[in-house]
């Protein structure tokens, strides 16, 4: 496994961990899509493992895909656009689009997220919460990076 793929896998795992309500399902879904990373910037048919992963995710884990497609900045962190991700699906002959995320019966990724915390009385209160969350994310990222290299 190349260094880039390992970093991508670690970053995707961190992203999945940040989606706390459905952590186990999200982590599994995202990790299954790692074989698609090398095919994102090509115009050829992706490898069979990638296409099989996409087909399975559309059939069994639509909530996860919807979360990935509709979370602002999630794909952008890897220089991937929603159009590129959907184009990869089309090259695998998987016909789905964002309307599947809002179709009747398809779970809404936003519905599973916890409600926002009540606003603090001062800006200082909000800043403290953001700092605490930042330390947690930083710790997770550093732990994953160190486990890859050591």
Curated annotation (Swiss-Prot):
Record membrane topology: Lipid-anchor; GPI-anchor
Which N-terminal residues, if any, form the signal peptide? 1-25
Please identify the protein, giving its name as recorded.
Non-specific lipid transfer protein GPI-anchored 7
Renumbered residue ranges of the record's region Disordered: 103-125
* Entry superkingdom: Eukaryota
* Disulfide topology: 29-66, 36-50, 51-92, 64-101
Gene designation per UniProt: LTPG7
* Tissue-wise expression: Up-regulated in the epidermis of stems.
The record's listing under SUPFAM superfamilies reads: Bifunctional inhibitor/lipid-transfer protein/seed storage 2S albumin
User: Among its keywords, does the record have Protease?
Assistant: no
Q: Which family does it belong to?
A: Belongs to the plant LTP family.
What this chain does, per the entry, is described as: Probable lipid transfer protein.
- What InterPro entries does the record point to? Bifun_inhib/LTP/seed_sf, Bifunc_inhib/LTP/seed_store, LTSS
Main location group: membrane
Q: Which UniProt keywords apply?
A: Cell membrane, Disulfide bond, Glycoprotein, GPI-anchor, Lipoprotein, Membrane, Signal
What are the residue ranges of the propeptide? 126-150
Q: Where is the lipid attached (GPI-anchor amidated aspartate)?
A: 125
Where in the cell is the protein located? Cell membrane
Asked if the keyword Glycosyltransferase belongs to this entry, the reply reads no
List, alphabetically, the GO terms of the cellular component aspect.
plasma membrane; side of membrane
Q: Which residues are glycosylated?
A: 41, 79, 93
């Amino acid at each position: 496994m190349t260094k880039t793929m390992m970093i991508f896998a670690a970053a995707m795992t961190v992203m999945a961990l940040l989606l706390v309500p459905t952590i186990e399902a999200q982590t599994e879904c995202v990790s299954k899509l790692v074989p698609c990373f090398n095919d994102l910037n090509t115009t050829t048919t992706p490898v069979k493992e990638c296409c099989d992963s996409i087909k399975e995710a559309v059939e069994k884990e639509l909530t996860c895909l919807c979360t990935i497609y509709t979370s602002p900045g999630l794909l952008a962190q890897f220089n991937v656009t929603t159009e590129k991700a959907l184009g990869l699906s089309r090259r695998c002959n998987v016909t789905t689009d964002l309307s599947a995320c809002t179709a009747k019966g398809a779970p809404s990724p936003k519905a599973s997220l916890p409600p926002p915390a009540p606003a603090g009385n001062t800006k200082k209160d909000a800043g403290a919460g953001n700092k605490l969350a930042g330390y947690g994310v930083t710790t997770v990222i550093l732990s994953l990076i160190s486990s890859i290299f050591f």
